[in-house]
Amino acid sequence: ALSFFAVFGVLKVFSLFKSTSENPYVMPAALVVLFIILQVYFNHKEVNKSSTYTFEDYTKALVESTEKNSIIFSYEWDYLVSPAYYFQNVENFRRDAVIIDKELLRRSWYYNQLMRNHPGVAGRLKPYSEPFLKALLPFERSENFSPELLETLYRTMMTKLVEDNVESRPFYIASELVENEMARGEFTLPKGYSLVPDLFLFKVVKDDSTYVPARNPDFTIRLPKYRDHYISFIENTVGAMLVRRAMYEMKFDHTERAKMYLNKVKKEFPDYQIPYSLEQAFN
């Protein structure tokens, strides 16, 4: 809209000078060039992302931290899912990993994409996805539908997604699902399963009393000098997961490994506030 009105503004300037000047195009052209230069000068620093590699680093490090043929369940569209789809399909990066967007499971077209890209996973989900898609159809057509039935089928399907795949594929769940939907009881794990903090994600395990190893935090995420909401989100998310992993290591008396994760936070994510009690445990 602003660009639309700017064009009319430029035309108005040209028309004014055309009737009062012998060289009607010189001054308006100079004003337009000056306006462009000022816009570039005042906005370039803020909008220039040519040296920002945070999203690539975060996405690749997260996916690389998972085991082969793993399933990653998330709805971090801006930070993880859409970049991962790009790197998988354009750069052939870790195409073995199945990345499923929790929110896109609410859309019928997404199941065609899952069936095309991951027929094994989508096929096992069919007994639960087909009733959901049938209940979803009137909603997508703006017809009368049952929101209670739709939500019940949706929640059941998410739980079955874990249950029917966790024995054949490593299954990882992103922290936003744990902190939100699982905390509110909108998404539950199959009976007998629990979560262990891994490096960037939570891993679904059958016996949480047995120690589950994770990779060393030897990844690198390049953070830009100028922070915005997106960069801060990644910084806080990674910091929180590393702290959770450190606390998990402490639970099994792996003090040195716990220190390793905390030192990673202090060194590379200094803005993240480590819990005071955890800091004191090492002092």
Language-model region placement:
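ER/secretory pathway lumenal C-terminal domains and tails of membrane proteins involved
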Residues: 2-71, 75, 79-283
